């Protein structure tokens, strides 16, 4: 019969204590990570969309149509002009700042249409163009959007974002109050289309939809700067599903970015931030 000696009992006790201590450490580590990285993809939170079940292959349309290829038209500049144009474009974009104080002054709709057309020239996976730009000008609708965002943002700051994230934002003097959502003459909400639809009603795959739409957002920011307008890039955490329903967008569209657009108010201020030097962002091999 096997007998437990005092030494063996002691060893077993030590092992049990060690296991429980490590379990506690892992639990605490997971809690800390959750506080540091509180982001949850809104796609996982939108209860209004269809359940994610395996779908019949017949519901999807394969792209089989042929596309004619045509000669490429290109303008090549002399090297000196290339240097000048690239420098001027850099200097223009280097003046771009995130502006939270936006005037209510009217912005011509033609300008908004042009900057969105510019954004729509972005490349996309298999040329699916998986973006929808929703332009909001109606004051009542803007205020409803503000109410939803501020309600969720207050919870974000108080509970979801975690101490480190909130601390990192203090230097920007930002909080859950978003007055610019009322004052800006135009709000542009950019939705990614998770999939599209063919003419026969079947679903079309939208490859790399989030990357494609993100590139379009970058072009939109550059176009706004070129037009002399300002904005602040807003990613409404946990607001996407409610805003999508408010704006009557279908369930296969997910809100990616919201941009309040207009002229800066006369008393607008921005943080005196410095951008990284070239040698900190570029590596030549």
From Swiss-Prot:
<feature type="binding site">
    <location>
        <position position="126"/>
    </location>
    <ligand>
        <name>3,5-diiodo-L-tyrosine</name>
    </ligand>
</feature>
<dbReference type="GO" id="GO:0030659">
    <property type="term" value="C:cytoplasmic vesicle membrane"/>
</dbReference>
<feature type="binding site">
    <location>
        <begin position="96"/>
        <end position="100"/>
    </location>
    <ligand>
        <name>FMN</name>
    </ligand>
</feature>
<keyword id="KW-0560">Oxidoreductase</keyword>
<keyword id="KW-0968">Cytoplasmic vesicle</keyword>
<dbReference type="GO" id="GO:0042403">
    <property type="term" value="P:thyroid hormone metabolic process"/>
</dbReference>
<feature type="binding site">
    <location>
        <position position="153"/>
    </location>
    <ligand>
        <name>3-iodo-L-tyrosine</name>
    </ligand>
</feature>
<keyword id="KW-0285">Flavoprotein</keyword>
<comment type="subunit">
    <text>Homodimer.</text>
</comment>
<feature type="binding site">
    <location>
        <position position="157"/>
    </location>
    <ligand>
        <name>3,5-diiodo-L-tyrosine</name>
    </ligand>
</feature>
<comment type="similarity">
    <text>Belongs to the nitroreductase family.</text>
</comment>
<feature type="binding site">
    <location>
        <position position="178"/>
    </location>
    <ligand>
        <name>3-iodo-L-tyrosine</name>
    </ligand>
</feature>
<dbReference type="GO" id="GO:0010181">
    <property type="term" value="F:FMN binding"/>
</dbReference>
<dbReference type="GO" id="GO:0140616">
    <property type="term" value="F:iodotyrosine deiodinase activity"/>
</dbReference>
<keyword id="KW-0812">Transmembrane</keyword>
<feature type="binding site">
    <location>
        <position position="126"/>
    </location>
    <ligand>
        <name>3-iodo-L-tyrosine</name>
    </ligand>
</feature>
<feature type="binding site">
    <location>
        <begin position="233"/>
        <end position="235"/>
    </location>
    <ligand>
        <name>FMN</name>
    </ligand>
</feature>
<keyword id="KW-0472">Membrane</keyword>
<feature type="binding site">
    <location>
        <position position="178"/>
    </location>
    <ligand>
        <name>3,5-diiodo-L-tyrosine</name>
    </ligand>
</feature>
<feature type="transmembrane region" description="Helical">
    <location>
        <begin position="1"/>
        <end position="21"/>
    </location>
</feature>
<feature type="binding site">
    <location>
        <position position="157"/>
    </location>
    <ligand>
        <name>3-iodo-L-tyrosine</name>
    </ligand>
</feature>
<keyword id="KW-0521">NADP</keyword>
<protein>
    <recommendedName>
        <fullName>Iodotyrosine deiodinase 1</fullName>
        <ecNumber>1.21.1.1</ecNumber>
    </recommendedName>
</protein>
<feature type="binding site">
    <location>
        <position position="153"/>
    </location>
    <ligand>
        <name>3,5-diiodo-L-tyrosine</name>
    </ligand>
</feature>
<keyword id="KW-0288">FMN</keyword>
<feature type="binding site">
    <location>
        <begin position="124"/>
        <end position="125"/>
    </location>
    <ligand>
        <name>FMN</name>
    </ligand>
</feature>
<dbReference type="InterPro" id="IPR050627">
    <property type="entry name" value="Nitroreductase/BluB"/>
</dbReference>
<dbReference type="GO" id="GO:0005654">
    <property type="term" value="C:nucleoplasm"/>
</dbReference>
<dbReference type="Pfam" id="PF00881">
    <property type="entry name" value="Nitroreductase"/>
</dbReference>
<dbReference type="GO" id="GO:0006570">
    <property type="term" value="P:tyrosine metabolic process"/>
</dbReference>
<dbReference type="GO" id="GO:0005886">
    <property type="term" value="C:plasma membrane"/>
</dbReference>
<feature type="binding site">
    <location>
        <position position="275"/>
    </location>
    <ligand>
        <name>FMN</name>
    </ligand>
</feature>
<keyword id="KW-1003">Cell membrane</keyword>
<dbReference type="InterPro" id="IPR029479">
    <property type="entry name" value="Nitroreductase"/>
</dbReference>
<dbReference type="InterPro" id="IPR000415">
    <property type="entry name" value="Nitroreductase-like"/>
</dbReference>
<comment type="function">
    <text>Catalyzes the dehalogenation of halotyrosines such as 3-bromo-L-tyrosine, 3-chloro-L-tyrosine, 3-iodo-L-tyrosine and 3,5-diiodo-L-tyrosine. During thyroid hormone biosynthesis, facilitates iodide salvage by catalysing the oxidative NADPH-dependent deiodination of the halogenated by-products of thyroid hormone production, monoiodotyrosine (L-MIT) and diiodotyrosine (L-DIT). The scavanged iodide can then reenter the hormone-producing pathways. Acts more efficiently on 3-iodo-L-tyrosine than 3,5-diiodo-L-tyrosine.</text>
</comment>
<keyword id="KW-1133">Transmembrane helix</keyword>
